[in-house]
Amino acid sequence: MSQRGIVLYFQVHQPNRAKPYTVFDTGIDHTYFDTASNAPWDNKAVFLKVAEKSYRPMNALLLQLLNTYPDFRVSLSITGVFIEQAREWAPDVLEGFKRLVETGRVELLAETYHHSLAFFFSQAEFERQVKQHEVLMQETFGVTPRVFRNTELAYNNDLGQWAESRGYKGILSEGWNPILEWRSPNYLYRPYGTSNIALLLKNYQLSDDIAFRFSNRDWPEFPLTANKYHTWVNQSLGDQDIMNLFMDYETFGEHQWEDTGIFNFFSEFVGSWIREYGNSFYTVSEAIDTFEPKEALSMPYTVTWADSGRDLSAWTGNKLQQEALRYVYSMEDDILRTGDESLIR
């Protein structure tokens, strides 16, 4: 009988923030990004700040846990944009991720290169970015990901079927109650209309207890200790298969600052979980190889892990956003015809 276990997945991304740019700058100022002002949109300053608060200490903690506990596992997805920034401004951060992958117990997942929602607007652009990301993972880490994760965990039936058609063995999604209804997120599922790919669902309640509520002093469960959280995971998982805890890497140190105790909490929880008989950690692929999907699950409309609506409304919720997206994608063919990689990017 397979041991029940936790699947830890962290998303690693840092966007390129556009600087303030008005209609009067059009045709005059062709520099859209800032890396020298120390303003909130200074991409270099932001990256270096988060590297110090989050990336370096979390990389060090994960490596320590991997060295301490042979059964510890974790899965990551790292965008191409993040790797570009790390190479330029903090190469040691990228080396830290390489050391994690070299342990053989950290799995890298596939995604879009630019943290893009292109799947919902341009299949060609989406597939171009996925391929670009795949090449980067091979060049940087020497691995070819076999499980797909879309930006913001955005998922629907069409994406699940696409992932199977491209040979992926699994795909991730938000385990949103209105979709699950009576079902539990603590099993593998089969994407609707597929036969050879697994769907892993985020347990959003327990994931978000760490990601969003950990340091909230108005939360009735504050403070969250490792022992309390261990009890909650035990109660939720019971005799089911897997607990999928999915969150941003920056949860540790940036969203939840070091002085909240987040790093100690995580270390203590990992140790207590492993020490309890019958518990395991799995990478995403190991979970897929270990357990059978419980049933097919249909998501006819798009679900994400963003905001309270768990949909695309954060990016497409008003007319201005919709028109901007329409206009950008209307230029796709013209831009591609230029062959100018700096423009295409």
Where are the regions a protein language model picked out?
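Short, charged, surface-exposed secondary-structure boundary motifs
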Residues: 119-121, 179-187, 209-211, 293
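CE4/NodB-like, metal-dependent polysaccharide N-deacetylase domain
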Residues: 123-152, 232-246
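Short, well-structured secondary-structure segments
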Residues: 3-10, 14-122, 146-149, 169-174, ...
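Catalytic domains of cell-wall/extracellular-matrix polysaccharide-remodeling enzymes
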Residues: 131-186, 251-269
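Acidic, His- and aromatic-enriched active-site or binding-groove loops in soluble protein domains
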Residues: 93-110, 143, 164-201
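Active-site and substrate-binding clefts of carbohydrate-active enzymes
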Residues: 2-54, 67, 187-197, 201-204, ...
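Generic structural signal for well-ordered alpha-helices
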Residues: 59-63, 94-98, 127-137, 160, ...
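Short, solvent-exposed loop/turn segments at secondary-structure junctions
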Residues: 12-15, 80-84, 113-118, 153-156, ...
